[in-house]
């Protein structure tokens, strides 16, 4: 009987830990409306999409900054052309109202 109580307690603690982790993750995912309650499945799917979106944005910023420096040295004052977001990016922005980070986003 004691072993069953211990096992139940441990499982309850584990489940609370998982639920707390999902609650923290939900707070990091932009949604519309902002207080929308997401299921665990929705949370994981949107987190993956949001991470992919952010990786793409950061990669483009890095390429843009590197490109500007290289073009500035070679071509003078001609800035690189701005690329429009992919259809998936526009859908993510429209569906979930993802704020696009400005130049100072994440700066110390």
Curated annotation (Swiss-Prot):
Record organism: Mus musculus
Protein name listed in UniProt: T-cell acute lymphocytic leukemia protein 2 homolog
bHLH domain ranges (all copies): 2-54
Cited Pfam families: HLH
Keyword terms: DNA-binding, Transcription, Transcription regulation
Alphabetized InterPro entries for the sequence: bHLH_dom (IPR011598), HLH_DNA-bd_sf (IPR036638), TAL-like (IPR040238)
GO biological process: midbrain development; multicellular organism growth; post-embryonic development; thalamus development
Positions of region (Disordered): 76-108
Phylogenetic lineage: Eukaryota, Metazoa, Chordata, Craniata, Vertebrata
UniProt key word Transcription: yes
GO molecular function: DNA binding; DNA-binding transcription factor activity, RNA polymerase II-specific; protein dimerization activity
Organism superkingdom: Eukaryota
């Amino acid at each position: 009987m004691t072993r069953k109580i211990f096992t139940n307690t441990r499982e309850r603690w584990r489940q609370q830990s998982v639920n707390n982790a999902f609650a923290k993750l939900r707070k990091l995912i932009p949604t519309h409306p902002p207080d929308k309650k997401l299921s665990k499945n929705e949370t994981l799917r949107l987190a993956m999409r949001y991470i992919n979106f952010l990786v793409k944005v950061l990669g483009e910023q890095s390429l843009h900054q590197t490109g500007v420096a290289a073009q500035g040295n070679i071509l003078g004052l001609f800035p690189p052309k701005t690329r429009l977001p992919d259809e998936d990016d526009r859908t993510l922005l429209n569906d979930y109202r993802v704020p696009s980070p400005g130049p100072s986003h994440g700066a110390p």
